[in-house]
Amino acid sequence: MRHRLFTLVLGLAVLITAGCGFHLRGTTQVPAQLQTLVLDSSDPYGPLTRAVREQLRLSDVKIVDDATRQDIPSLRVLSSSETRDTVSIFQDGKTAEYQMVLTLQAQVLMPGEDIYPLSVTVFRTFFDNPLAALAKDAEQDIVRQEMREQAAQQLVRKLLTINGSQEVKNRLQSTDSPTAAKRS
């Protein structure tokens, strides 16, 4: 009896999560027109560009190394900045906690179409333990790398907005065409 009840509850849970469109977060399905693109960055071997390249590859995007190609879309990583602000302090006035902010500016150039700007911001808090200076530095490096990976994931997910904005633009152009023809 207990086994049947467990099977029933498990089956209902699977049906409910599948029915509502829930999916485990995995790779992002990049639109077909962005399945092949040029990745352009001022620091092509830097940690942020490597993280973006890795996320694109995980999403089955073919990265072309020829930056002179004008017939395929181009993802340009324009700039990134890391800032660190004090969030709280100890009684003696030393910093107890930081908020680290990573901001990434990029743009996608579609051949023969518009330029689509993308911006990603990632926030993290970091506890500054003055008693463990070496461990603090190692932990801060790990947090920075996680922030870069998270920014790269968000950037790849934002590629979906380009497809959506192109569809809206195409719909607007198609609805404007019959209206203009009727006026003539």
From Swiss-Prot:
Q: Does the keyword Lipoprotein apply?
A: yes
- Any one annotated GO CC term: transporter complex
Q: Do the record's keywords include Signal? A: yes
Give the record's membrane topology.
Answer: Lipid-anchor
Write out the entry's keywords from A to Z: Cell outer membrane, Lipoprotein, Membrane, Palmitate, Signal
Q: What InterPro entries does the record tag this protein with?
A: LPS_assembly_LptE (IPR007485)
Lipid modification (S-diacylglycerol cysteine) maps to C20
Q: Where is the lipid attached (N-palmitoyl cysteine)?
A: C20
Which stretch is the leader sequence? 1-19
What the entry lists under PROSITE patterns is as follows: PROKAR_LIPOPROTEIN (PS51257)
GO terms for MF: lipopolysaccharide binding
Q: Which Pfam families match?
A: LptE (PF04390)
- Which positions are tagged coiled coil? none
- Localization annotation: Cell outer membrane
Q: Which Gene3D superfamilies match?
A: Lipoprotein like domain
Any Gene Ontology biological process: Gram-negative-bacterium-type cell outer membrane assembly
Q: What does this protein do?
A: Together with LptD, is involved in the assembly of lipopolysaccharide (LPS) at the surface of the outer membrane. Required for the proper assembly of LptD. Binds LPS and may serve as the LPS recognition site at the outer membrane.
Q: How is the quaternary structure described?
A: Component of the lipopolysaccharide transport and assembly complex. Interacts with LptD.
NCBIfam families attached to this UniProt entry: PRK10796.1
Name under which the protein is recorded: LPS-assembly lipoprotein LptE
Species for this entry: Pectobacterium atrosepticum (strain SCRI 1043 / ATCC BAA-672)
